[in-house]
Amino acid sequence: MKQVVQNYKSGELAVLDVPVPGCKPGGVLVRSAYSLISTGTELMKVSEAGMSMLGKARSRPDQVAKVMQSVATNGVPATYRKVMGKLDSYTPLGYSLCGVVEQVGDGIDDVKVGDLVACAGNEHALHAELNWVPKNLYAPVPDGLAPRHAAFGTVGSIAMQGVRQGEPQLGEVALVIGLGLIGQLVVQLLAASGVRVVGVDPDPVRCELAERLGAAACGDPESAAVEAAVAELTGGHGVDQVYLAAGGGSNQPVELAARLCRDRGRVVDIGKCRLDLPWNAYYEKELDVRFSRSYGPGRYDPAYELEGRDYPIGYVRWTERRNLACFLDLVARGKVDVEPLISHVADFDDAVETYQRLKDGDLKAITALFRYPEQGVEAESPALAVPTVNVKPSPARAAKTPVRLAFVGAGNYATSMLLPHLTQREGVELSTVVTTTALSAANA
């Protein structure tokens, strides 16, 4: 099958032929129909890969800290090999798609082969023709909802979780700073919740779009029109809640939030902007600063995401899977309109060119979609059942016959520390590598 990958060392993008993932218990194998390119988070990752080593270090201080810790533990040579091995391997892209169930793993009873599902996760909803997706990271698509619209499920869940963190109430007024993809969805979700919205973005085209999609007023962060709109809608008290859906290194969004929020209002960070809080402004108003973690409760919990252990609805009403299903329902019922957010649709074979145009600025888009070949071609994937293996003693071999090895597991440590030593040894031949993901097999 084909998959979009990027070499993080060189920044090179490619569409590779990689092995088809197996359909493991607790999940489904999905053939992609549409996958979504996030022009915010995802494009930032693509741009970072094209930076110099110094630029990469400056953009990811968290990774630099891990490298320094590894140097202290393992020494410089081992750390260098590990880091360069990680950088010089292919990394996947994508995290939001819609597709058709191709195979159903053991323990799955809520979907069947041929059903349309929306899938989430930066390890399971990749820009690839086929993905294995665990139960809690997919949701059935409601009848009548177009696959291109269902592909917004993941980013819709991100916006929805941010709105839930703000706890909006009927009649309140909210400020949304940043009117990119997530900001536009937040505007619509708030409007659907009975909240009047003021949007802020330096791009007048995005401001106009947000007003079409339900915002009461929008404007440039530097303009007096935004403050005037807030004063008019709130009687001069300030907005009840602010949603930070902007990115970048400017501290302006955080400062603007404090200036336009009412006393004891709520500020929710959804994007990845600078957060140097002006202490006096936040203290004097006793503002409640909250963070929104990705798609919702369950995110980053392996027991939930990989093992399929759901949280009881009485204790956790909105998990990431229930957020995903809820967003799809809102789009299907016309409460949220994603069609105006689709700036470009590209064939999957043109993925590299599309990324390059987005990166270079030749293609201006709030979001873009990859369209995959028509459904119906069966995947050449391993059978669900694990075959019985009969172990027999190996016959004696000639002294100069190479030892043929099969290697199970090809993660970062194996590919940087173990496999290089094995493949360089005289008389050793690596015949087979078995891994859980298609891309780790390709890297090996």
Model-derived features: where do they sit?
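C-terminal capping/lid region of NAD(P)-dependent oxidoreductase domains
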Residues: 4, 232, 236, 241-243, ...
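Glycine-rich beta-strand-centered segment in the early N-terminal region that forms part
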Residues: 21-36, 45, 49-122
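Short, well-ordered loop/turn sites that connect or cap secondary structure elements
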Residues: 37, 111-112, 168, 261
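Mid-domain Rossmann-like dinucleotide-binding core that forms the NAD(H)/NADP(H) cofactor-binding site
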Residues: 116, 123-124, 146-223, 228
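Glycine-rich cofactor phosphate-binding loops and adjacent beta1-alpha1 units
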Residues: 166-168, 208-209, 213-292
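Conserved acidic E/D residue at the C-terminus of a beta-strand in Rossmann-like folds
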Residues: 201-202, 293, 432-436
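C-terminal substrate-binding/catalytic core of Rossmann-like NAD(P)-dependent dehydrogenases/reductases
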Residues: 277-341
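N-terminal Rossmann-like dinucleotide-binding module
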Residues: 381-444
